[in-house]
UniProtKB/Swiss-Prot annotation:
The lineage of its organism: Bacteria, Bacillati, Actinomycetota, Actinomycetes, Bifidobacteriales. InterPro entries: GAF-like_dom_sf, HrcA, HrcA_C, WH-like_DNA-bd_sf, WH_DNA-bd_sf, WHTH_transcript_rep_HrcA_IDD. GO terms for molecular function: DNA binding. Residues 307-318 have a biased composition (Low complexity). Transmembrane segments: none annotated. This is Heat-inducible transcription repressor HrcA. It comes from Bifidobacterium adolescentis (strain ATCC 15703 / DSM 20083 / NCTC 11814 / E194a). Pfam families: HrcA. Keywords: Repressor, Stress response, Transcription, Transcription regulation. Belongs to the HrcA family.
Length: 375
């Protein structure tokens, strides 16, 4: 659309429809917006916008409502995302700072985002495939069983049972654990698996080489299992109060398909620029149950370059360097996402601001930087 006035008319229609969920007429627009032209001129502009696919007239005598194309143009070029107020930011910090651990923080974040937007909020736990090792402990639990407790850089804790024919020597096991913590801290789980295999091949660990391979397989499993990322959801009951949301049953079905949601929202958050917000509207979600919904999401906890390079020093003493690059992660890649799901007539500007603010807070939480503002 080359004409700036038509752009103003489209923005006015979208904003009014978001507020009222009623078809918008030219008389209303000229009365409520300073467009500087007559109602007849606005009516002609609306007809042109309809011809171009940005608006639709549900009934002959009714006003017009935005189409997906209209919403998309609004989100991409016309919507102004206003930062949250100081009071809202303080509220977010106050509510989330009372959490005791990562799980509690993510649960609180989902509840808070649902409360702010009045829509469904979804927060994913940091993916193990995008995490690095912070610490590991290996402890005996029976005569032929060990428990490996793995803590990642994002605070996630994973436990794995390691079955052995006989418990290893305590000194050797302690030495292996200490070396893993020294050499593999800050290294991706895939490369940690390679590092552990190389340790197990050394003479000093010959007696526990089978254990080392079992442990390496456990690290591989953690790195490969995207399903290990938990989803925290809040606000689903709010959908029932959205009187204009069509096809509620398919929408609830879509919310139950957590793997589908994970792929959709992860993909959307990863395609945004640093600190950005991604929006998928209706059919853009490629999800049948979300044809009448929009998804707003942002990544959080972005990785650093150190996380991708950490394997170099870990492998130096273990003769590695068959690093094909398959495990390389781009610096700044989000480790998880936070998002909001609501009707296509959602308040995009407010939702985008809220999602971005919560994502920033979670990034600061993972970085242990409580002083960073959630703007």
């Amino acid at each position: 659309m080359a004409q700036s006035r038509r752009m103003l008319v489209l923005r006015a229609v979208v904003e009014d429809y978001i507020r009222s969920q009623e078809p918008v007429g030219s008389t209303t627009l000229t009365r409520d917006h300073d467009l500087g032209v007559s109602s007849a001129t606005v009516r002609n502009d609306m007809a042109a916008l309809e011809d171009e696919g940005y608006l639709i007239q549900p009934h002959t005598s009714a006003g017009r409502v935005p189409t997906e194309k209209g919403y998309r143009y609004f989100v991409d070029r016309l919507a102004t995302v206003v930062p949250l107020s100081e009071a809202q930011r303080r509220g977010i910090n106050s509510f989330l700072s009372g959490s005791v651990n990562l799980q509690d923080t993510l649960q609180r974040a989902a509840r808070l985002l649902a409360q702010i937007t009045g829509q469904v909020a979804v927060v994913a736990a940091p993916s193990l495939s995008k995490s690095t090792l912070r610490h590991i402990e290996i402890v005996p639990v029976s005569i032929n069983t060990l428990l490996a407790v793995v803590i990642t850089d994002t605070g996630r804790v994973a436990q794995h049972i390691l079955n052995v024919t006989k418990l290893p020597d305590v000194t050797t096991l302690t030495h292996l654990t200490n070396e893993i913590n020294t050499q593999c801290s800050g290294v991706s789980l895939t490369r940690t698996a390679d590092c552990v295999r190389q340790m197990g091949a050394r003479k000093e660990y010959h007696a526990i080489s089978t254990l080392a391979e079992t442990l390496a397989q456990a690290f591989d499993g953690m790195a490969d299992d995207e399903r290990a990322s938990e989803l925290y959801m809040a606000g689903t009951s709010r959908l029932a109060h959205q009187r204009t949301v069509a096809d509620l049953a398919p929408l609830f079905d879509a919310l139950e398909e957590q793997v589908v949601l994970m792929k959709l929202m992860s993909s959307l958050s990863e395609t945004t620029q640093s600190d950005g917000v991604g929006v998928a509207i209706g059919s853009e979600t490629h999800t049948p149950g979300l044809l009448h919904a929009s998804v707003v999401t942002s990544g959080y906890g972005r990785t650093s370059a150190a996380a991708t390079d950490g394997a170099t020093h870990a492998a130096a003493s273990s003769q590695t360097e068959n690093q094909s690059g398959d495990d390389t992660r781009q610096a700044g890649e989000p480790v998880a996402f936070v998002g909001s799901i609501g009707p296509t007539h959602m308040d995009y500007a407010a939702t985008m601001a809220a999602v971005r603010a919560v994502a920033r807070y979670l990034t600061a939480f993972l970085a242990h930087d409580e002083g960073q503002p959630a703007d």
